[in-house]
Amino acid sequence: MSTVAKTNPKSSNKPGPVKSIIAGGVAGAIEISITYPAEFAKTRLQLYRNVEGTKAKLPPFGLEWYRGCSTVIVGNSLKAAVRFFAFDSIKKSLSDEHGHLTGPRTVLAGLGAGVAESVLVLTPFESIKTAIIDDRKRPNPRLKGFLQASRIIVHENGIRGLYRGLAATVARQAANSGVRFTAYNSIKQSLQSRLPPDEKLSTVTTFLVGSVAGIITVYCTQPIDTVKSRMQSLSASKEYKNSIHCAYKILTQDGLLRFWSGATPRLARLILSGGIVFTVYEKVMEILKPF
């Protein structure tokens, strides 16, 4: 009996896979519902091409900025669920007997989470979202929503149409998760070490730590994100042979700074995103802890 009493508290402190999936899914859905306009602006700016010196333009703020939102809400909740489940699973397998994770192993866990979410969830949903946003620039847009856009893309391009830009998406998410989780865990552990063992970081502090992790992530990974968006545009199959060819054309035709196009709205989103996702995730995990 005494053995059971000692081991149960320890095991209950470790997040199970179901709890990670639920907490990650809830966090992802709430985050994108709040930050989607910034995602729309980022994607539109990344899809802009230099044509006779014209400047990139965004439509007046309104419902137009929520085109493709339903697609991303579903995709983001699934993505976050897969990301946190994968990260927690990999982290658990790489941790020492005290549950501690070294810096390099944290990076490895983050990279693994990024690859998992890219292949299983993100690429198809990102392809549909980007196609819907890109389609809105046309005189007579065809794509109206997630299901209808999915049918058209699959009908015209096959299943491979949903996986356009897979390599760039995997690279971006691996880099995103590697940088983001490493920054978040490093800062969090540093701050937590200054507190008593039984005291947790406040909600405000957790939000700020997540926001800082988001800022670091944006500037490290924006070039890959721009290539990904271009590879998932409606004209990608006619313009680019692969992600490397796409990056070369952006560099030679639009210049080096074009790789950071859309960085400002993405930064705005990830500052909020990092704070919202990690804060909601931690809170949901606390709520689920007794179960």
Curated annotation (Swiss-Prot):
<feature type="transmembrane region" description="Helical; Name=6">
    <location>
        <begin position="259"/>
        <end position="280"/>
    </location>
</feature>
<keyword id="KW-1133">Transmembrane helix</keyword>
<dbReference type="GO" id="GO:0005743">
    <property type="term" value="C:mitochondrial inner membrane"/>
</dbReference>
<keyword id="KW-0496">Mitochondrion</keyword>
<feature type="repeat" description="Solcar 3">
    <location>
        <begin position="201"/>
        <end position="287"/>
    </location>
</feature>
<dbReference type="InterPro" id="IPR049563">
    <property type="entry name" value="TXTP-like"/>
</dbReference>
<dbReference type="GO" id="GO:0071913">
    <property type="term" value="F:citrate secondary active transmembrane transporter activity"/>
</dbReference>
<dbReference type="InterPro" id="IPR018108">
    <property type="entry name" value="Mitochondrial_sb/sol_carrier"/>
</dbReference>
<keyword id="KW-0999">Mitochondrion inner membrane</keyword>
<dbReference type="Pfam" id="PF00153">
    <property type="entry name" value="Mito_carr"/>
</dbReference>
<feature type="repeat" description="Solcar 2">
    <location>
        <begin position="104"/>
        <end position="190"/>
    </location>
</feature>
<keyword id="KW-0677">Repeat</keyword>
<feature type="transmembrane region" description="Helical; Name=1">
    <location>
        <begin position="21"/>
        <end position="41"/>
    </location>
</feature>
<protein>
    <recommendedName>
        <fullName>Uncharacterized mitochondrial carrier C19G12.05</fullName>
    </recommendedName>
</protein>
<feature type="transmembrane region" description="Helical; Name=4">
    <location>
        <begin position="169"/>
        <end position="189"/>
    </location>
</feature>
<keyword id="KW-0472">Membrane</keyword>
<feature type="transmembrane region" description="Helical; Name=2">
    <location>
        <begin position="70"/>
        <end position="90"/>
    </location>
</feature>
<dbReference type="GO" id="GO:0006843">
    <property type="term" value="P:mitochondrial citrate transmembrane transport"/>
</dbReference>
<keyword id="KW-0812">Transmembrane</keyword>
<feature type="transmembrane region" description="Helical; Name=5">
    <location>
        <begin position="201"/>
        <end position="221"/>
    </location>
</feature>
<dbReference type="GO" id="GO:0005739">
    <property type="term" value="C:mitochondrion"/>
</dbReference>
<dbReference type="InterPro" id="IPR002067">
    <property type="entry name" value="Mit_carrier"/>
</dbReference>
<feature type="repeat" description="Solcar 1">
    <location>
        <begin position="15"/>
        <end position="93"/>
    </location>
</feature>
<comment type="similarity">
    <text>Belongs to the mitochondrial carrier (TC 2.A.29) family.</text>
</comment>
<feature type="transmembrane region" description="Helical; Name=3">
    <location>
        <begin position="108"/>
        <end position="128"/>
    </location>
</feature>
<keyword id="KW-0813">Transport</keyword>
<dbReference type="InterPro" id="IPR023395">
    <property type="entry name" value="Mt_carrier_dom_sf"/>
</dbReference>
